[in-house]
Curated annotation (Swiss-Prot):
It holds the Pfam family A_deaminase. Zn(2+) binds at H14, H16, H204, D284. It comes from Haemophilus ducreyi (strain 35000HP / ATCC 700724). Binds 1 zinc ion per subunit. Keywords: Hydrolase, Metal-binding, Nucleotide metabolism, Zinc. This is Adenosine deaminase. Its EC number is 3.5.4.4. One of its GO terms (cellular component) is cytosol. It is an enzyme of class 3 (hydrolase).
Length: 344
C-alpha cells in the first residue's frame, strides 16, 4: 500500500529551485566559482543546507537558503541548476513540475533580473531536451521585504514579457518569503500591477500567518495559494476556496518543519479533500526539507493513512491546478494514463 501510494508522486507544482539544489551539484559549482563551502562531501554539506530537527519556525527555515543562493549568481550556474533539477525529477519518475525562483535574488554579482530569467529558461530547455518529462515550467517569485517594490514590479514585467501559454517557459508569478514579518496586505500594488497585465499568480499564504492572509490573496485574485494551511481556521475563507475552486499547494514535510502544524494528525488535508477544496501535494524544497514528491505521499501513507482514492484525487487536483492550457492538461492526463496506467 505504501509503495503504491508513493507512485502517485509524479507532479510537483510547488518546488523552489534554491531549496532543491543537490549537494553534489553545489560542491561541483562551488569549485568552478571558487566559493568556499563549510564541508567537502555531499553528506557533510547536507547538514548546512537542510533544516535542523529542532527548527523553530519559517524564519529559521528560510536561513537554509543563503548558501545555495550564493552559488546561483552567474548565468552558467543558474542554467546548470535548472537542468540538473529537471534531470533529477525525471530520474524520480515525474512527468510535470513547476519550478519557482526569485530573479531579484540572483543579482548579487553582475546578472540583471532578465539575465537570470534567460539563464533559467536556457536551463529549462536543456533539461527538457534530455529527459522524458511531459513538460516543466517556471514561476517567477516576487519577495516579501520592506523596500523592494521596484524589484517586484520588475519581476512582474519580466513575467509578462516571457509569459507562455503553449511552450515550456514562464507561466506565473508568486510572492514568497517571510510571511510572518511582511504581511500579504502590503503587496496589493504588485498584484494590481499583475492583474492589469494579465499575469496569473499564486501567493504563499496561510503558512506563517493566519486565514486573513489567505483571504487577502483571494481578494488580490490569486489563481492558487501556496500552502494555505490556516484557511481551515476560517469558515468564510474555506467557503471561498471551495466556491472559487482555488487550489492549495500543500507541502506536508515542510509544514511540519516550520511548525505550521505541530503534528501530522493535525494536518487539514483530509478535511480539505472531504469538503471539496482543490488540495495538491508538493515538496516545497527537496534539499532543505530532505524530501521528494514520492516521500510526501509515503509520509502521508505511513503516518496519515492516506487512501488510494485520496492519492488519486490529489493527482487529479494537481493536473487541474497546473498553470497549463486546457489542451495541455488533457495531454498531461493522457501522458500519465499511458505511462502510469495503474494510477488513473
Amino acid at each position: 500500500m505504501v509503495l503504491g501510494l508513493a507512485q502517485y508522486g509524479v507532479i510537483d507544482l510547488h518546488l523552489h529551485l534554491d531549496g532543491s539544489l543537490s549537494p553534489a551539484w553545489m560542491i561541483e559549482w562551488a569549485k568552478k566559482q571558487a566559493v568556499n563551502l563549510p564541508a567537502s562531501t555531499a553528506e557533510a554539506l547536507t547538514a548546512y543546507v537542510s533544516v535542523p530537527q529542532d527548527c523553530s519556525d519559517l524564519n529559521e527555515y528560510l536561513r537554509c537558503f543563503d548558501l545555495p543562493l550564493s552559488l546561483l549568481q552567474t548565468p552558467e550556474a543558474l542554467s546548470s541548476a535548472v537542468t540538473d533539477l529537471i534531470q533529477r525529477l525525471d530520474q524520480d519518475g515525474l512527468v510535470y513540475a513547476e519550478i519557482r525562483f526569485a530573479p531579484q535574488l540572483h543579482t548579487q554579482r553582475s546578472m540583471s533580473q532578465e539575465d537570470a530569467v534567460k539563464a533559467a529558461l536556457r536551463g529549462l530547455q536543456a533539461g527538457l531536451a534530455s529527459t522524458s518529462l511531459f513538460k516543466a515550467n517556471l514561476i517567477l517569485c516576487c519577495m516579501r521585504a520592506a523596500d523592494n517594490r521596484s524589484a517586484n514590479l520588475e519581476t512582474i514585467c519580466l513575467a509578462k514579457q516571457y509569459l507562455t501559454k503553449y511552450e515550456a517557459g514562464v507561466v506565473a508569478i508568486d510572492l514568497a518569503g517571510a510571511e510572518g514579518l511582511f504581511a500579504t496586505q502590503h503587496f496589493q500594488q504588485e498584484f494590481d500591477f499583475a492583474n492589469q497585465r494579465g499575469v496569473p499568480f499564486t501567493i504563499h499564504a496561510g503558512e506563517a500567518a493566519g486565514p486573513e492572509s489567505v483571504q487577502q490573496a483571494l481578494d488580490f485574485g490569486a489563481t492558487r495559494i501556496g500552502h494555505g494551511i490556516r484557511a481551515i481556521e476560517s469558515e468564510t475563507v474555506m467557503k471561498q476556496l471551495i466556491d472559487k475552486r482555488t487550489p492549495l499547494e500543500m507541502c506536508p514535510c515542510s509544514n511540519l518543519q516550520t511548525k505550521t502544524v505541530a503534528q501530522l494528525a493535525d494536518y487539514p488535508l483530509r478535511t480539505f479533500l472531504m469538503r471539496g477544496v482543490v488540495a495538491t501535494l508538493n515538496t516545497d524544497n527537496m534539499t532543505v526539507s530532505q524530501t521528494c514528491i514520492q516521500q510526501e505521499y509515503r509520509l502521508l501513507a505511513e503516518q496519515y493513512q492516506l487512501s488510494i482514492s485520496e492519492a488519486k484525487q490529489l493527482l487529479l487536483n494537481s493536473i487541474a491546478a497546473a498553470f497549463l492550457s486546457n489542451e495541455d492538461k488533457k495531454a498531461l492526463l493522457a501522458h500519465i494514463q499511458q505511462r502510469y496506467p495503474q494510477l488513473i
